[in-house]
Amino acid sequence: MSVLVPMVVEQTSRGERAYDIYSRLLKDRVIFLVGQVEDHMANLAIAQMLFLESENPNKDINLYINSPGGAVTSAMAIYDTMQFVKPDVRTLCIGQAASAGALLLAGGAKGKRHCLPHSSVMIHQVLGGYQGQGTDIQIHAKQTQRVSDQLNQILAKHTGKDIERVEKDTNRDYFLTPEEAVEYGLIDSIFKERP
């Protein structure tokens, strides 16, 4: 399926310049994470963050998230880059931030993590499905548990909740309204209008 990306035209001293909407917003330091978190999305988001850091290491990067989650390894690559780059990464949930999306939302700079009023946030444990020999399944189960523990530690760090509480809450799908996400410590505020 082909998707039409809107173009915007800007007047410059040298005439008109046409941009696709996402390139134009990137000039304003806005990155979109929309849809399943996977390797291609992670590659683009990481490249954009590194580019914006090289352009101005002292100006915030704005990460708009509308994601049902996805591949943990891709999410961890984005998360690690968010922590690695010098600029603060502001996060804003614009629809849903579930699973890996919630991890990225919470991983924004403290005081700069937000939701729009009708957004939804969901945390849960790592999902995995494996087949094969019993020993291979055991190996994958141990790896899944290790990654799950790692993600719970990250959520505990960013929310200020103790690890036991995070483990209990991520044991099943745990949905939060924006107000509940503020109380939990996943975000810092709800944007009801542009600040």
Swiss-Prot record:
GO cellular-component terms in the record? cytoplasm; endopeptidase Clp complex
One of this protein's GO BP terms? protein quality control for misfolded or incompletely synthesized proteins
User: What coarse category fits the chief subcellular location reported for this protein?
Assistant: cytoplasm
The record's InterPro entries line, in alphabetical order, gives: ClpP, ClpP/crotonase-like_dom_sf, ClpP/TepA, ClpP_Ser_AS
* Keywords linked to the UniProt accession: Cytoplasm, Hydrolase, Protease, Serine protease
Q: Which reaction does it catalyse?
A: Hydrolysis of proteins to small peptides in the presence of ATP and magnesium. alpha-casein is the usual test substrate. In the absence of ATP, only oligopeptides shorter than five residues are hydrolyzed (such as succinyl-Leu-Tyr-|-NHMec, and Leu-Tyr-Leu-|-Tyr-Trp, in which cleavage of the -Tyr-|-Leu- and -Tyr-|-Trp bonds also occurs)
| Origin: domain of life | Bacteria
Q: What residue range is the signal peptide?
A: none
Q: What is the annotated localization of this protein?
A: Cytoplasm
- Is rRNA-binding one of the keywords UniProt gives this record? no
Task: List the catalytic residues.
Answer: S99 (nucleophile), H124
What EC identifiers does the entry list? 3.4.21.92
Which GO molecular function annotations are given, in alphabetical order?
ATP-dependent peptidase activity; ATPase binding; serine-type endopeptidase activity
Family from the record: Belongs to the peptidase S14 family.
Q: What does this protein do?
A: Cleaves peptides in various proteins in a process that requires ATP hydrolysis. Has a chymotrypsin-like activity. Plays a major role in the degradation of misfolded proteins.
Binding partners and assembly? Fourteen ClpP subunits assemble into 2 heptameric rings which stack back to back to give a disk-like structure with a central cavity, resembling the structure of eukaryotic proteasomes.
Name of the protein in question: ATP-dependent Clp protease proteolytic subunit
State the species of origin: Coxiella burnetii (strain RSA 493 / Nine Mile phase I)
User: Top-down, what is the taxonomic lineage of the species of origin?
Assistant: Bacteria, Pseudomonadati, Pseudomonadota, Gammaproteobacteria, Legionellales
State which gene encodes it.
clpP
